[in-house]
Amino acid sequence: MNKLESACYLAEADEAPFDKLHEECGVFGIYRADSANKSVVAETYHALYALQHRGQESCGIVVNDDGVMKAHKDNGLVTEVFTRDALSKIHEGTMAVGHCRYGTTGMHSRSNAQPLLINHQKGAMALAHNGNLTNAAELREQLEKNGAIFHCTSDTEVIAYIITQERLKCGSIEQAVLNAM
């Protein structure tokens, strides 16, 4: 490779958006066995507020209260989505996951706000994701050909669908995630 070819190759590599780590989105998770002393909702809210420089398009929180999951998410800044009134309506639990989105795939819409909450035969799963699934279009097309119905345009839903498929075949969520990889 001569110097010109080398320079062109490097320029092309620099333009490739998914070959390096990027700062996109903010993701936070918390588990507290004893939720009587501190609020997982408040801690998740404060974490998202601190992380919102990583994504100001939309945000959301899913709380798990003994297997019952509730979500609150919308477009906007953390302080716009999680008003005092909205926060007071979110039930406490022992686990929560929060996400603030910097959209790199999918449209700017409420349906693409994360975490996604997926209900299936073996229960429910909340999923938040930072980054891009580089083969999302191909996987989505394959899943749709096999009957999958998608509710948003985010690549996170592709990941959620694959993990859910694996979860229905195995004994634990941990094994399902490993199988999906």
Each language-model region and where it sits:
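Conserved short alpha-helical segments that host acidic/polar catalytic motifs at enzyme active sites
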Residues: M1-M181
